[in-house]
């Protein structure tokens, strides 16, 4: 898939701008705080209906404006289609091919993106929350079912935590409601856990040879999903559901005492091993960065396998964070097959054939100077 054109109105520091996009590489050059990252963020937000930088949509609206609008014209193998997002202080509306979508699960997935920013280098050494968010955002793009299950799980989790807190504070004494919530909780917790395990297994299959290639076969990479729900090797989902139910029942007193749900996908983690050693604890900065790069490149391939189209790659000031060999591997991998948007303060130091055919835009105070 390709983004042919991007139009912004009242988005961050952009009053009104139209970007005619190159089908291969688009380089956004400018000093810091001029709007380069805002432009990449708008593409990400158009794809996933949420920003990677803030959970408050009001921050996306230009100062003193009533609304923000993002519109993109996409081209696929089978044709073209516009996506539109309106953001107001009351919420947001999304349209696919001019038709309003009343559920975000019907919207997300029409535009697939992979974002690689400096903070993504923290996927290995960052908190479990960072890794869970990574899984949810990537898996949600390729599976509307997962996105719906996750939404249901988060709703039930919130209800369960509220009720646990009331039981802890002795505001409630009847545990029947908690048992009902646990039945629903177990259903969606199991669905999400199984889908995540499958996703990580697929990602590992693609990431291992990429990592080996980047390191000239000096390193091996293994991914390990670490669920808080310790399940057996059983493959029958009905029996696995019973296991989850029993675990929740056995730990009901403990959860009431703590006033919070202690088990479930919201407590899970993802581990990385380089040469069979935990990369988070023992990996060098170089190994951690290579791992992050391998994962991102594997994402690109996985989306192509699942969707049948390569995603759009957003590189937010990350090339300067990679050494020459990693930079070369990244650019060589995406060349001629992945539409890419790159932000940078300078093209000096980016020495690759791909740059000869790139389209350059200068960004200055919310305006694009070609």
Swiss-Prot record:
Subcellular location: Cytoplasm
Residues given in the record as ATP binding sites: 30-37
Any GO molecular function: single-stranded DNA binding
InterPro entries, per database record: DNA-binding_RecF (IPR001238), DNA-binding_RecF_CS (IPR018078), P-loop_NTPase (IPR027417), RecF/RecN/SMC_N (IPR003395), RecF_2 (IPR042174)
Biological process according to GO: DNA replication; DNA synthesis involved in DNA repair; double-strand break repair; SOS response
Keywords: ATP-binding, Cytoplasm, DNA damage, DNA repair, DNA replication, DNA-binding, Nucleotide-binding, SOS response
One GO cellular component term: cytoplasm
Alphabetical list of CDD domains matching this protein: ABC_RecF (cd03242)
Coiled coil spans: none
PANTHER family noted in UniProt: DNA REPLICATION AND REPAIR PROTEIN RECF (PTHR32182:SF0)
Family, as annotated: Belongs to the RecF family.
Alphabetical list of HAMAP family matching this protein: RecF
Function noted in UniProt: The RecF protein is involved in DNA metabolism; it is required for DNA replication and normal SOS inducibility. RecF binds preferentially to single-stranded, linear DNA. It also seems to bind ATP.
Name of the molecule in the record: DNA replication and repair protein RecF
Organism field: Staphylococcus carnosus (strain TM300)
Lineage, opening ranks: Bacteria, Bacillati, Bacillota, Bacilli, Bacillales
Designated gene of the protein: recF
